Amino acid sequence: QVWAAVDADASLRRASSLPCNVEVTDVSAHKGAGLRWLCAHLGVDAADTVAFGDASNDVTMLEAAGDGVAMANALPEAVAAANHATSSCDDSGVARYLMPLLRAL
């Protein structure tokens, strides 16, 4: 019933970073909006950013980044939002993805 009530309210967004919690926020408050704000504030094109995520609360950020990368343990919705994937955090997935990019600079 709670999910139905939240989902029925177009002004709310629900997401989760862990199976044991839920995040209910204003529809405009999400990681994608935060990334776009930060890019505008710093004068950086969002197309030049890389974001890593694994949960439903990362979906908007993965979509907003120029390069959205799903971790190996990512939930299906995060994988669908990403355009690349990497190994898990336990396997240094972020470093494994970034090192070739940094070496190419």
List the model feature ranges, each with a label.
Residues L35, D45-C89:
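Acidic, Mg2+-coordinating phosphoryl-transfer loop and its flanking beta/alpha structural elements
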Residues N21, D90-S92:
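A short, acidic, flexible beta-alpha connecting loop/helix-capping segment that sits on the rim
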Residues Q1-F52, S56:
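Conserved acidic, metal-coordinating active-site core of Asp-based
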Residues W3-D7, R36, E63, V79, ...:
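Class I S-adenosyl-L-methionine
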